[in-house]
């Protein structure tokens, strides 16, 4: 049976550190690669990421700035922002063995190309095996060993199962799937919808409005997923409904917190507070892709318009509430 005993994690931010911890708990030999010199030094000397304070890195994890060292692992987790994934994979490609699984752990769509994460991997490293990890998971929870379930998808069922086994620990439970598109699509779409939910919270519109926004947001996710070939069961699973539910209900979500700040009257630049809210980058791309397939996404459209400065929060809310009445889907 296929197995991966060594795992490299590229990216020493909060999520990368958490996944490195998970790999170590699962009994794998883990190498954590960090590009940033200051954070790499912090990880090596103090065994703590600048982006995840209070979590001590497992002593078995090797920290490196040498990409070729990380490339020797049997499976590689790509825990870098969606918009720099292509750059990282392009640098990694000449260093890896054929069929090495490259697992995207970012939730987004590339600007300009409209490519999903596994499509970028396939283009930049054609000899690799693209895969995706997604689901309702916060770095702080995972790093501390709190119970979490995610989905890992690859087109080859055996590889997906082996990757899930490699990251399986007592508290981190990966389910495996072959619906790569469905898994990555859910993660990217929910980022935009979480901003909308945050706006509702920040505007203090109440629990009823938040429930309505989340539910109708899921309808948009389903429409978009169906148009782009996702399986219905995937949309109803961890990487779809599960991730959406989590990120539309707690300030631990960067996208939700970003939306809360927008709802309180902050500008997009002020609302970011120096942290990456991937949904802000994904929103305009998502809308372009929806138009190509004639998919109606009014909530996502409103978020994109707010971020572009084309409409105020109050005007966006009014436009959603005054849309023509229709039968529920």
UniProtKB/Swiss-Prot annotation:
Q: Which InterPro entries match?
A: 6-PGluconate_DH-like_C_sf (IPR008927), 6PGD_dom2 (IPR013328), G3P_DH_NAD-dep (IPR006168), G3P_DH_NAD-dep_C (IPR006109), G3P_DH_NAD-dep_N (IPR011128), NAD(P)-bd_dom_sf (IPR036291)
In which compartments does the protein localize? Cytoplasm
Q: Name one Pfam family in it.
A: NAD_Gly3P_dh_C
Cellular compartments per GO CC: cytosol
**Binding site residues for NADPH:** 15, 35, 51, 107, 139, 254, 276, 278
The GO molecular function terms of this record are: glycerol-3-phosphate dehydrogenase [NAD(P)+] activity; NAD binding
Biological processes, Gene Ontology terms: carbohydrate metabolic process; glycerol-3-phosphate biosynthetic process; glycerol-3-phosphate catabolic process; glycerophospholipid metabolic process; phospholipid biosynthetic process
Q: Where is the active site?
A: 190
Q: What is its EC number?
A: 1.1.1.94
Alphabetically sorted, this entry's keywords are: Cytoplasm, Lipid biosynthesis, Lipid metabolism, NAD, NADP, Nucleotide-binding, Oxidoreductase, Phospholipid biosynthesis, Phospholipid metabolism
Identify the pathway: Membrane lipid metabolism; glycerophospholipid metabolism
- Which residues of this UniProt protein bind sn-glycerol 3-phosphate? 107, 135, 137, 190, 243, 253-255
Q: Which Gene3D superfamilies match?
A: N-(1-d-carboxylethyl)-l-norvaline Dehydrogenase, domain 2, NAD(P)-binding Rossmann-like Domain
Lipid biosynthesis in keyword set: yes
The region annotated as signal peptide is: none
- Which SUPFAM superfamilies does UniProt cross-reference here? 6-phosphogluconate dehydrogenase C-terminal domain-like, NAD(P)-binding Rossmann-fold domains
- Its domain of life? Bacteria
The reactions it catalyses are: sn-glycerol 3-phosphate + NAD(+) = dihydroxyacetone phosphate + NADH + H(+); sn-glycerol 3-phosphate + NADP(+) = dihydroxyacetone phosphate + NADPH + H(+)
The protein's role, per its UniProt record: Catalyzes the reduction of the glycolytic intermediate dihydroxyacetone phosphate (DHAP) to sn-glycerol 3-phosphate (G3P), the key precursor for phospholipid synthesis.
Entry's family note:
Belongs to the NAD-dependent glycerol-3-phosphate dehydrogenase family.
Q: What is this protein called?
A: Glycerol-3-phosphate dehydrogenase [NAD(P)+]
Question: Per the UniProt entry, what species is this protein from, by scientific name?
Answer: Rhodopseudomonas palustris (strain BisB18)
- The gene that this protein is the product of is gpsA
């Amino acid at each position: 049976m296929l197995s991966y005993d060594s795992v490299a994690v590229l990216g020493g931010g909060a999520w990368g550190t958490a996944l490195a911890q998970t790999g170590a708990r699962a009994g794998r030999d883990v190498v954590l690669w960090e590009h940033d010199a200051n954070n790499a030094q912090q990880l090596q000397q103090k065994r703590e990421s600048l982006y995840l304070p209070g979590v001590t890195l497992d002593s078995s994890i090797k920290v490196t700035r040498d990409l070729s060292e990380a490339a020797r692992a049997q499976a590689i987790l790509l825990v870098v922002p969606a918009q720099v994934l292509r750059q990282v994979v392009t640098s990694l490609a000449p260093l890896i063995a054929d069929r090495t699984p490259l697992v995207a752990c970012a939730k987004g769509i590339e600007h300009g190309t409209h490519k999903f994460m596994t499509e970028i991997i396939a283009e930049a490293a054609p000899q690799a095996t693209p895969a995706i990890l997604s689901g309702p998971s916060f770095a702080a929870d995972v790093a501390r060993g709190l119970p979490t379930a995610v989905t890992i998808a690859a087109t080859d069922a055996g590889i997906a199962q082996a990757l899930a086994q490699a990251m399986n620990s007592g508290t981190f439970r990966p389910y495996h799937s072959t619906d790569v598109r469905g898994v990555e699509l859910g993660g990217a779409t929910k980022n935009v919808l979480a901003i909308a939910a945050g706006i509702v919270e920040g505007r203090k519109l109440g629990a009823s409005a938040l429930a309505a926004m989340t539910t109708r947001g899921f309808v948009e996710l389903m429409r978009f997923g169906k148009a782009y070939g996702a399986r219905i069961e995937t949309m109803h699973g961890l990487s779809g409904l599960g991730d959406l539910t989590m990120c539309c209900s707690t300030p631990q979500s960067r996208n939700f917190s970003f939306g809360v700040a927008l709802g309180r009257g902050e500008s997009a630049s002020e609302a970011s507070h120096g942290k990456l809210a991937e949904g802000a980058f994904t929103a305009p791309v998502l809308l372009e892709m929806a138009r190509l397939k004639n998919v109606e996404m009014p909530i996502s459209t409103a978020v994109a318009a707010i971020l572009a400065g084309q409409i105020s929060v109050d005007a966006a809310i009014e436009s959603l509430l005054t849309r023509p009445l229709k039968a529920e889907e």
